[in-house]
């Protein structure tokens, strides 16, 4: 009975929670260069439990608690007006360095637009480690590349371990 009360009190007081956590979106369409990794300027917070996401200058998540974090980011790649999309990549960078990515490739049958979601688990030190969302859009004509704001987003939360 005493253990049940301790667990219940911890849950209701917030002592056990998947925080810090955040979810943010791209506030408006972002123009990007053709075939180049570009940071997504994620600037519209949906929520940010511990004020760890910078939505105004660096567009990065710097959690203030050490541990493992589940992070996810989606890039909506749009080549402009033509149906000549070659590929879209979505990747998460840690401390300014590329870690991993997901992609969709249309080289054999060009597309119009695509969303690519990437997820991963990251060890964070709780002080200086940070995560950022990057994307890469490539099209045959090489002009008009953009991240569409309707479906480009970034989020993360601490995993209870």
Tell where the protein language model's regions lie, with residue ranges.
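Extracellular jelly-roll beta-sandwich "head" domains, especially the C-terminal globular C1q domain
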Residues: 3-6, 14-161
């Amino acid at each position: 009975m005493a253990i049940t009360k301790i667990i219940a009190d911890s849950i209701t007081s917030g002592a056990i929670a998947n925080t810090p956590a955040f979810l943010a979106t791209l506030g408006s369409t972002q123009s990007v260069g053709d075939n180049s990794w570009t940071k997504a300027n994620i600037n519209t917070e949906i929520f940010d439990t511990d004020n760890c996401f910078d939505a105004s200058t660096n567009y990065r998540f710097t959690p203030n608690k050490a541990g493992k974090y589940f992070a996810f980011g989606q890039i909506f790649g749009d080549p402009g007006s033509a149906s000549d999309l070659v590929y879209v990549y979505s990747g998460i960078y840690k401390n300014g360095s590329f870690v991993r990515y997901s992609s969709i490739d249309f080289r054999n049958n060009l597309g119009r637009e695509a969303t690519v979601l990437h997820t991963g688990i990251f060890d964070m030190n709780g002080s200086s480690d940070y995560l950022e969302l990057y994307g890469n859009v490539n099209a045959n004509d090489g002009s008009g590349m953009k991240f569409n704001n309707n479906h480009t987003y970034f989020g993360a939360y601490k995993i209870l371990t």
